[in-house]
Amino acid sequence: MHSQIWVVSTLLISIVLIVLTIVKFKFHPFLALLLASFFVGTMMGMGPLDMVNAIESGIGGTLGFLAAVIGLGTILGKMMEVSGAAERIGLTLQRCRWLSVDVIMVLVGLICGITLFVEVGVVLLIPLAFSIAKKTNTSLLKLAIPLCTALMAVHCVVPPHPAALYVANKLGADIGSVIVYGLLVGLMASLIGGPLFLKFLGQRLPFKPVPTEFADLKVRDEKTLPSLGATLFTILLPIALMLVKTIAELNMARESGLYILVEFIGNPITAMFIAVFVAYYVLGIRQHMSMGTMLTHTENGFGSIANILLIIGAGGAFNAILKSSSLADTLAVILSNMHMHPILLAWLVALILHAAVGSATVAMMGATAIVAPMLPLYPDISPEIIAIAIGSGAIGCTIVTDSLFWLVKQYCGATLNETFKYYTTATFIASVVALAGTFLLSFII
């Protein structure tokens, strides 16, 4: 049995190893996580074959569920992108004269972000911000910051986004419940971290016009876009199916045939599978796309997820090593003796890891590995709440280590100092608000 000092030192060194190899030596996170897994296994006295078996089972067990859902989600997001469905939502909300432009951008980010990776969402939706900025003579920062904050919030707390789905799966949380809680917390965090924060700044927020190099980026002709009803139906269908499953689990007899049917169609894999074929028809065939064209778009979409799948698989390996080496059990005892609330601990670990590594996905996987062992010691706190707490932490501290920081800086034509002052601060405020929302939810449910 290893001493607590040895266990804590091993864990801390493994985290430092991950950060250094990614930030300093430019290792891919997949390799960094695998290296840390071998390091922990060796330091905890695992045999070579035991380490390999744990890594293999960790990768397989994690991707066995997530690979299918992420793949199907990628198709759904790609169809949203190529059909112009995301722009349809933005243009429709733009007509709501009772909403301010910054609130509109939050809603666009939240709704469209459900099916889009955060970086893809920024690239796809920023022309809408450009268009509104030109028409209303508004500072681009007032539009881009709420949009990007909302996209980041959804990315971290709402499945079927890969990191949020990974955390929910590893903690044994109900995915439908996490979706509902995540949307509530994400909306509150985005509105306060975006529009309310910018309103507080007032005239101190500098005016930023659309950068000249992006002046030619335009929103597509509205006549070529799918209808709003078709767009919303496609986005919300898989979420609705998963929520029906959650409701059924609370209210239906488990022996009934209807319950089995609802469990089947509400499973994330089945729900996303159904949604993909609805998207093919509603956003593809009805928009005069051929099956060959949709096949090409699907293949192009799959090319972009190899990176995230490998990172998530390696995160599963790291998690498996922590469990197999008994480090997780000892860590649970140590953390419980710290007398720090598990919600605060989950948030803080994810926040620090995001700042250090620059990837919200890696941060959430690392936080899950650290926090999960102590959950059995707190039966009154649901895994859904801890999942939201981890995601809330990962929203914050979007700094120079994160590619999203540079994307926002480039599109807004902002200086490094301005991006720190306005966007990094916005994400940190959103993260703190999300933490407060998570605590509030924990008292209610």
Curated annotation (Swiss-Prot):
Any Pfam family matching the protein: GntP_permease
Subcellular location: Cell inner membrane
Organism annotation: Escherichia coli (strain K12)
Topology of the protein relative to the lipid bilayer: Multi-pass membrane protein
Transmembrane segments: 5-25, 29-49, 57-77, 106-126, 140-160, 178-198, 224-244, 258-278, 302-322, 343-363, 364-384, 385-405, 425-445
Cytoplasmic topological domain: 1-4, 50-56, 127-139, 199-223, 279-301, 406-424
Keyword Oxidoreductase belongs to the record: no
Broad class of where this protein is predominantly found: membrane
Residue numbers on the Periplasmic membrane side: 26-28, 78-105, 161-177, 245-257, 323-342
One annotated GO molecular function: gluconate transmembrane transporter activity
Protein name stated in the entry: D-serine transporter DsdX
Gene Ontology cellular-component annotations: plasma membrane
Organism lineage string: Bacteria, Pseudomonadati, Pseudomonadota, Gammaproteobacteria, Enterobacterales
Coiled coil: none
GO biological process terms, semicolon-separated: D-serine transmembrane transport; DNA damage response; gluconate transmembrane transport
Induction info: By growth in D-serine, controlled by DsdC.
Role of this protein: A D-serine-specific transporter, may function as a H(+) symporter.
Record keywords: Amino-acid transport, Cell inner membrane, Cell membrane, Membrane, Transmembrane, Transmembrane helix, Transport
